[in-house]
């Protein structure tokens, strides 16, 4: 009985101290002629030895004054083992901060070690669509669990 309890405690201790990595990559910026811009950020998390990594890539659309108007986030889960990587789950979400904006279209797909999403947003002024912006998001995992 003592051996069983010791074994159980050893497993519990091993599981509870497995480090979980959370990494927020550098923020990239894409500017438009009117002064508005996208900020793009990749975040990833996953236990080092688990062979599973969850990543998000977020495009935030900002006005020329720096106000966030909406964001599109693609979230993917990958498995990897040093010789291959596969996207196992995916989702795409849109958060709207300014009520002038609405979702025109949204799609997501996964294929092998990559996942893509496309979000087109429209802006209505006085009930008429005045502009549209599209965010094309692609997230890829290499065989070592590195996201790009």
PLM feature spans:
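Mature secreted bioactive peptide module from preproproteins
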Residues: 44-148
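N-terminal prepro-regions of secreted/extracellular proteins
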Residues: 1-67
């Amino acid at each position: 009985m003592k051996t069983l309890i010791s074994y159980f405690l050893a497993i519990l201790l091993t599981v509870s101290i497995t480090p979980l990595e959370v990494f927020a990559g550098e923020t990239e910026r894409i500017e438009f002629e009117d002064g508005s811009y996208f900020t793009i950020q990749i975040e990833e998390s996953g236990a080092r030895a688990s062979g599973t990594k969850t990543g998000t890539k977020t495009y935030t659309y900002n006005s020329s004054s720096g106000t966030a108007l909406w964001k599109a986030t693609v979230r993917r889960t990958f498995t990897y083992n040093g010789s291959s990587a596969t996207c196992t789950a995916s989702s795409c979400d849109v958060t709207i901060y300014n009520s002038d904006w609405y979702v025109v279209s949204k799609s997501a797909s996964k294929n092998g070690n990559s996942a893509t999403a496309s979000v087109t947003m429209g802006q209505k002024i006085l009930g008429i669509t005045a502009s549209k912006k599209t965010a094309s998001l692609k997230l890829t995992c290499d065989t070592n669990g590195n996201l790009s």
